[in-house]
């Protein structure tokens, strides 16, 4: 186990490059967070684990209270990992319902399924599980079907997904519950190392679609943290269509290991990632991170958020 002193010994160069996270009070634990604001002003935070943890708060600052699980009995999908769901992505549909996409898998596996549930309130006990979206992988494809992210491009609902292997993909939906018939399209790939790229999140701003994603080692810092710069970090590419041709600030294609870093380790923040963007009087980048003054285990992860600034058409914190 990495000791407290070892955690403090992480490179002191990891400071002062980025703004510190916004204030968080109450139960601020989070892992691969999904975030949505209810019409009544309350914020709902969803996290990986069991039947998807739900916390709520009257403001982004909190105080946050864990209130239960979205699917306390797990998923109806008959697949390994269906009692320990990952990477929730929540949005409000045109029909007024809230939809949550989740992943069913096990660590290191490419045998994965993306499921979906719906609710009229986002409260624990209100979620109906609809099972699989029809999007799955078994190792014979180039992709891994986890980390779903929904967006509407024009009139078309799409899911972005993927983790490691051949990277990030996009597929059209036939509706909120099922995928369409078209094949997934590869939109980002990391050719370096172990191809560490995941947690795609697509956000529209000022005529562009910004593809946020996490690169680097996501966890295990409490037993063996990576070389400086190889831990989780948040990168971005952009496209004018949202359907491909994503490039970073230097013009490097996201299919050729491109990606401009938006947020990396600094000060007390180590390995930020699993991110999304909430429109809340401006764009709010949210994520989890491991506090450097803690034990760096997943159980110590914290909810982080920063308001995004836009400089020459690119997001900064």
Swiss-Prot record:
<feature type="site" description="Important for catalytic activity, responsible for pKa modulation of the active site Glu and correct orientation of both the proton donor and substrate">
    <location>
        <position position="147"/>
    </location>
</feature>
<dbReference type="InterPro" id="IPR050727">
    <property type="entry name" value="GH43_arabinanases"/>
</dbReference>
<keyword id="KW-0378">Hydrolase</keyword>
<keyword id="KW-0964">Secreted</keyword>
<dbReference type="GO" id="GO:0005576">
    <property type="term" value="C:extracellular region"/>
</dbReference>
<feature type="glycosylation site" description="N-linked (GlcNAc...) asparagine">
    <location>
        <position position="190"/>
    </location>
</feature>
<dbReference type="GO" id="GO:0046558">
    <property type="term" value="F:arabinan endo-1,5-alpha-L-arabinosidase activity"/>
</dbReference>
<comment type="similarity">
    <text>Belongs to the glycosyl hydrolase 43 family.</text>
</comment>
<dbReference type="InterPro" id="IPR023296">
    <property type="entry name" value="Glyco_hydro_beta-prop_sf"/>
</dbReference>
<keyword id="KW-0858">Xylan degradation</keyword>
<feature type="active site" description="Proton acceptor">
    <location>
        <position position="32"/>
    </location>
</feature>
<keyword id="KW-0326">Glycosidase</keyword>
<comment type="function">
    <text>Endo-1,5-alpha-L-arabinanase involved in degradation of pectin. Its preferred substrate is linear 1,5-alpha-L-arabinan.</text>
</comment>
<comment type="pathway">
    <text>Glycan metabolism; L-arabinan degradation.</text>
</comment>
<keyword id="KW-0119">Carbohydrate metabolism</keyword>
<dbReference type="InterPro" id="IPR016840">
    <property type="entry name" value="Glyco_hydro_43_endo_a_Ara-ase"/>
</dbReference>
<keyword id="KW-0325">Glycoprotein</keyword>
<dbReference type="GO" id="GO:0045493">
    <property type="term" value="P:xylan catabolic process"/>
</dbReference>
<keyword id="KW-0624">Polysaccharide degradation</keyword>
<keyword id="KW-0732">Signal</keyword>
<dbReference type="GO" id="GO:0031222">
    <property type="term" value="P:arabinan catabolic process"/>
</dbReference>
<dbReference type="Pfam" id="PF04616">
    <property type="entry name" value="Glyco_hydro_43"/>
</dbReference>
<feature type="active site" description="Proton donor">
    <location>
        <position position="198"/>
    </location>
</feature>
<feature type="signal peptide">
    <location>
        <begin position="1"/>
        <end position="17"/>
    </location>
</feature>
<dbReference type="InterPro" id="IPR006710">
    <property type="entry name" value="Glyco_hydro_43"/>
</dbReference>
<protein>
    <recommendedName>
        <fullName>Probable arabinan endo-1,5-alpha-L-arabinosidase C</fullName>
        <ecNumber>3.2.1.99</ecNumber>
    </recommendedName>
</protein>
């Amino acid at each position: 186990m990495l000791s407290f002193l070892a955690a403090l010994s992480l490179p002191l160069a990891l400071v002062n490059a980025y703004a510190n996270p916004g204030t968080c009070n109450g139960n601020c634990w989070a892992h691969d967070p999904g975030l949505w604001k209810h019409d009544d002003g309350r914020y709902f935070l969803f996290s990986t684990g069991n039947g998807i943890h739900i916390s709520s708060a009257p403001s982004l600052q909190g105080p946050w209270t864990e209130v239960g699980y979205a699917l306390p009995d797990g998923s109806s999908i008959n697949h390994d990992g269906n009692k320990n769901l990952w990477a929730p992505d929540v949005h409000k549909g045109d029909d007024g319902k809230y939809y949550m996409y989740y992943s069913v898998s096990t660590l290191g596996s490419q045998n994965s399924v993306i499921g979906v549930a719906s609710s009229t309130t986002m409260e624990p006990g209100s979620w109906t599980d609809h099972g699989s979206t029809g999007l799955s992988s078994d190792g014979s494809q180039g992709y891994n079907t986890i980390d779903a992210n929904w967006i509407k491009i024009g009139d078309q609902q799409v899911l972005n997904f993927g983790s490691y292997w051949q990277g990030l993909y996009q597929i059209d939906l036939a509706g909120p519950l099922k995928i369409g018939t078209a094949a997934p399209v590869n939109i980002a790939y990391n050719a370096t190392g172990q191809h560490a790229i995941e947690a795609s999140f697509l956000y529209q701003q000022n005529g562009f679609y910004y593809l946020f994603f996490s690169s680097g080692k996501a966890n295990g810092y409490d037993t063996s943290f990576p070389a400086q710069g190889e831990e989780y970090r948040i990168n971005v590419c952009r496209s004018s269509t949202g359907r491909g041709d994503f490039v970073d600030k230097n013009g490097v294609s996201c299919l050729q290991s491109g990606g401009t870093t938006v947020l990396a380790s600094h000060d007390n923040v180590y390995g930020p990632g699993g991110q999304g963007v909430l429109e809340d009087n401006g764009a709010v980048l949210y994520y989890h991170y491991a506090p450097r003054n803690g034990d760096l285990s997943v159980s110590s992860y914290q909810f982080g958020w920063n308001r995004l600034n836009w400089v020459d058409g690119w997001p900064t914190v």
